[in-house]
């Protein structure tokens, strides 16, 4: 804007200068022509007539007009000088404004460069983010494929012979645990029943002991066998099926002990069919081990319970004291 303004001012000054110069030149030319005509008139010697008198009057008027013309030239020069001074005073102001606008333009250019750099960085970040998103999508698809075609790490029921072998091994592992638990329960019952029913004889022979214990042992064997069959009837597997069928299914079997298995939803039907096809085998009759009654078992047990209760009370008291100290 200010460059255009300066150009316009310069053009106006040139026009004024040229117009004033043209006026001065025209006035000078007129004066020169008049002087030349007067000089030609003065060189000749014509006869004096009325026309000559008129010419003399005109020359006198020309002489009188010369100072007026010069005065006009001076005034025009003064005006031109004042206008030129005004233009000269205006030029530094315009220059200052142009400098200010140039500085502002430089600041704007720097800001534009900064914005361009930011845009470049943002575009680079966006491109890197797009690449990361693509890589993540690929990984997600790979994980989905792996989940769809994955193998079971906890327990894998395979098709064919290997699956059958693994299930048989699991069944064999479950059976000894159930037998151990039933044996432990029978031992506890025998130890609790013997001191009540079997009388303590002072130093009796082995033959008499066998005769006295044999009917009791038979009854205990029958009872244990019945209890074991009842426990097998009562112990039913708890099947927890999650709502999402793509997830694993937790099976807990309570046969004397908790056995948990994780199966896929696709293999659940095969596992249930295998369980239904297997015959229900009752555990073998446990071997009863005779234990002699000790008269010191009762007081020893009572003393141990008393000591444990005292220890628990002391421990609880110490814990409560620690909590109070920490609060304080």
UniProtKB/Swiss-Prot annotation:
PTM annotation (Phosphothreonine): residues: 182
InterPro entries found in the cross-reference section: Ccdc54
Lineage top rank: taxon: Eukaryota
Alphabetical UniProt keywords: Coiled coil, Phosphoprotein
Phosphoprotein as UniProt keyword: yes
Coiled coil feature spans: 93-151
Protein name: Coiled-coil domain-containing protein 54
Annotated source species: Homo sapiens (Human)
Higher taxonomy: Eukaryota, Metazoa, Chordata, Craniata, Vertebrata
Name of the coding gene: CCDC54
């Amino acid at each position: 804007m200010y460059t255009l303004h300066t150009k316009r001012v310069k053009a106006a000054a040139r026009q004024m200068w040229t117009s004033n110069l043209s006026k001065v030149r025209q006035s000078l030319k007129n004066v020169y022509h008049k002087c030349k005509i007067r000089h030609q008139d003065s060189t000749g010697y014509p006869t004096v007539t009325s026309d000559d008198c008129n010419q003399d009057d005109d020359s006198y008027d020309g002489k009188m007009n010369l100072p007026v013309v010069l005065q006009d030239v001076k005034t025009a020069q003064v005006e031109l000088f004042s206008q030129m001074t005004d233009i000269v005073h205006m030029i530094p102001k315009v220059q200052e404004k142009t400098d200010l606008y140039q500085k502002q333009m430089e600041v704007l250019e720097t800001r534009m460069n900064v914005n361009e750099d930011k845009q470049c960085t943002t575009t680079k970040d966006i491109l890197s983010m797009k690449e990361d998103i693509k890589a993540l999508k690929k990984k997600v698809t790979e994980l989905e494929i792996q989940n769809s075609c994955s193998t079971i790490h906890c327990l894998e029921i395979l098709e064919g012979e290997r699956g059958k072998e693994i299930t048989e091994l699991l069944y064999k592992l479950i059976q000894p645990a159930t037998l151990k638990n039933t044996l432990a329960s029978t031992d506890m019952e025998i130890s609790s029943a013997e001191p009540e029913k079997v009388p303590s004889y002072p130093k009796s022979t082995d033959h008499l002991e066998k005769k006295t214990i044999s009917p009791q042992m038979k009854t205990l064997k029958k009872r244990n066998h019945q209890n074991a069959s009842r426990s097998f009837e009562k112990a039913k597997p708890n099947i927890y099926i999650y709502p999402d069928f793509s997830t694993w299914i937790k099976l807990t079997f309570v046969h004397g002990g908790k056995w948990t298995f994780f199966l896929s939803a696709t293999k659940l039907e095969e596992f249930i069919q295998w369980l239904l096809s297997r015959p229900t085998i009752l555990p073998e009759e446990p071997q009863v081990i005779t234990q002699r009654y000790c008269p010191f078992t009762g007081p020893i047990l009572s003393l141990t319970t008393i000591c444990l209760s005292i220890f628990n009370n002391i421990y609880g008291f110490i814990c409560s004291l620690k909590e109070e100290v920490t609060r304080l």
